[in-house]
Amino acid sequence: MGIQHLNKYIRNKITLYNNNNNNNKEEGSAIKTITFSELNGKKIVIDTSIYMYRFSSERCLIDSMYQMISLFKMNGIIPIFIFDGPSPVEKKELIKQRREEKQISETKYKELHYKLKDVNDYEERKEINNELDSLKKKFVRLKREDINNVKNLLTLYGVTYYEADGEADKLCAKMVTEKHAYACLSEDMDLFVYGCDKVLRYISLLNSTFVLYDLNKILECLDISFTHFKEICVISGTDYTCHYNDSLSCNSINPNNSINPNNSINPNNSINPNNSINPNNSINPN
C-alpha cells in the first residue's frame, strides 16, 4: 500500500527541524544519501516487484537485475529478495482500479502511436514520443515468465529470495524489525507503519547510491510517538482506503506529541531463521 503525501510531509518537517537547529549537514540526518559501500557487510531485504516493474518499463529487466545484484556483491551488500504472494482481499478494489487505468493508458498509447504516422513536424513528433514513453510505463505488466526468469537469475547467482504469503512489504518490514536485515530497499512509505526503522529509497545504479530514511530519527524530528505517526499515516490514506477522497493535506498536520523511544518500534511476532525461513521458498510473515 502507499501513503499519500507522507514523503513530502516528512521532508518538509525535517527541513524545518534542521533549520531551527542550525543543522545543515546531511551526516546524522533522518534522511540522507549513502553509497553502496557504506552498507558493506550488511543484509538488506528488497521489495522485488517494485524494481521489476521499473526495469520492465525500461525494457531491461534481466540486465538491470543482474547489474543490481553485481553492484551489491561488489560492495559487500548481502541482498535478500522478497517476492509478492497473493494480494489480500482488502486490495481487490484497488487492483481492479489499477487494471482499468492500465487499459485506459494502453488504449491512449495505441491511439497516439497510430497518430504519429501522420505527423511530420519535428517538435510535435518529439512531444508525442515523450508522451508515448510516459504512457508505456503506466501499463507495464509482469508475466509469470518474467518472475521465473528473475528467480532463476537469483538462483544462478547464489542470492537468497523468499516468496511472501501476501504482499512483500510486510515480510520485508518484519525481517528488519527482527534484525534479520539492516534495512529494506523499497519505494513504498508504508513500511514505516509496520515499524521498519530503516528504508532505502531512490536507488541509483549509475551512482551506486541510496537515500536512507531512519524512522527513529524521523520520529525525533517530528516530535511524535510511533503510535501517533501510524495514526497520521492511516488518516493520510492507503491503498486499502482508495475509495475515500479525504486524504490528509501536508500542511494540515501539526503533531505536538513527544516521542517515546520505547514504543517507536513495535514488531509483532518473531521469525526463527532456523525453522520458519526457507530460502527460495514461501514464508508466512505471521
Q: What residue spans do the PLM features occupy?
A:
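Non-catalytic, usually N-terminal nucleic-acid engagement modules in DNA/RNA processing proteins
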Residues: 1-111
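Periodic short-repeat tracts
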Residues: 255, 259-279, 283-285
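Extended two-metal-dependent nuclease catalytic cores across DNA- and RNA-processing enzymes
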Residues: 15, 20, 96-256, 283-286
